[in-house]
């Protein structure tokens, strides 16, 4: 079973992703703060740009670098309301950027596509 880590500080969004991904057959772990992020092995990470209140490329890149250091080689899908993140997707190292608000069917489809590579 594909293990997915969801990182989002908004309880509604985190719970929605937990339910949608769980219903799609994924093993889902949710972290709402950086302290909550477990050290176990995952196949994919779906993350909000948690530490980025006002978007800057540098802050977004710092967040994704921290995830890459903690989970080397694990693909990251960014789910964010920051339109600039889509423009910077390749430079940020995100496998995909999904804009909030999103169609709930996009999340499991993106995880399937990302983990199939």
Where are these regions (language model features)?
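Acidic, metal-coordinating helix/loop segments flanking the phosphotransfer/catalytic sites
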Residues: 5, 27-44, 48, 52
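Hydrophobic/aromatic residues positioned on beta-strands within the core alpha/beta folds
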Residues: 77-79
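His-Asp phosphorelay/catalytic-motif detector in bacterial-type signaling
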Residues: 69-75
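As written
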Residues: 90-98
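Conserved phosphotransfer microenvironments
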Residues: 47-67
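Acidic di-acidic motifs
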Residues: 8-9, 100
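C-terminal output helix
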Residues: 102-113
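Two-component/phosphorelay signaling modules centered on CheY-like receiver
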Residues: 11-29
């Amino acid at each position: 079973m594909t293990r997915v880590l969801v990182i989002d500080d908004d309880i509604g969004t985190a719970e929605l992703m937990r339910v949608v991904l769980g219903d799609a057959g994924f093993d889902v772990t949710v972290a709402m703060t950086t302290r909550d992020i477990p050290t176990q092995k995952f196949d994919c990470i779906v993350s909000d740009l948690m530490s980025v209140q006002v978007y800057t490329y540098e802050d977004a890149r710092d967040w994704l670098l921290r995830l890459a250091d903690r989970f080397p080689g694990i693909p990251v899908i960014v789910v964010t309301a920051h339109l600039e993140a889509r423009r910077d997707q390749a430079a940020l190292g995100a496998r995909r950027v999904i804009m909030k608000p999103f169609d709930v069917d996009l999340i499991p489809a993106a995880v399937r596509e990302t983990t199939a590579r």
